Amino acid sequence: MPENVASSGLKNTNGQDITSLGEALNNAMEIIENDGVFFTPKSLVKMIVSVLEPKSGTLLDPACGSGGMFVQTGDFVNLAGMNANMVMTFYGQEKVEYNSRLCLMNIAVHGLSGKIKSGEEANTYYYDAHNLEGKCDYVMANPPFNVDKVKSESCQNAGRLPFGLPGVNKKTKEVSNANYLWISYFYSYLNEHGRAGFVMASSATDSQNRDKDIRGQLIKTGHVDVIVSVANNFFYTKSLPCSLEIEKTDKRDRKRLNAEWDAKIA
């Protein structure tokens, strides 16, 4: 256990129930942000979960960090009178092994269980570590913003790109900005009735070139449900403004929606 977690309140939890211990751990995560953990404010996580209203099924967070999406979902389901471990299956990918261990500890402290992959095999750009394309009822995530130097050929080979690659640097053959890789992944993981909620850099709402093309294709599906603008300086370690985006799919109706769209613009 990280030393500064133990000194931030956990040592005072003797006699407290597991929920109190979990709350102490959540509070500690705000303190250890400088140790490499990218903490997502609980209010943003809670909003995503409240909008998606998970009840049962498979939940994937392909950039799971310390596991906040799982914990909040567990709380939501349990408060609805169900047992989250009985009705939900949690899957996570987290490349940084320290963060994945913190995630496992976090969900365990909250009485939850999940399948968390870490290390290079959990690099979502290049691997679908749990083989969940098209199988998820829910996808929730706060991925890293504006990542560059992602190998385009490896991304292409890994699939999960229903709208194609975003912009690629012709000289280096690297993806210039990975925001729309993440957005494509979230969409591709959903099953026919899936719902996705995620945090994204606000620049993704009006980025140009291939990003604009992908955004147009996504909007054309009719599955973009809600976009909420989040003000600057909302995160503890980030000053960039961001947005919360919600997708709700019924992919069986995609052909019908496309036909209706084409008729409107004809």
Predicted feature locations:
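Non-catalytic, mostly N-terminal accessory regions of nucleic-acid modification and defense proteins
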Residues: 1-43, 47-50, 115-118, 123-126, ...
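A generic structural signal for ordered alpha-helices
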Residues: 3-6, 26-27, 37, 81, ...
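Intrinsically disordered, low-complexity segments enriched in small/polar residues
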Residues: 7, 13, 20, 34, ...
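A conserved structural/catalytic subdomain of Rossmann-like adenosyl-cofactor enzymes
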Residues: 133-266
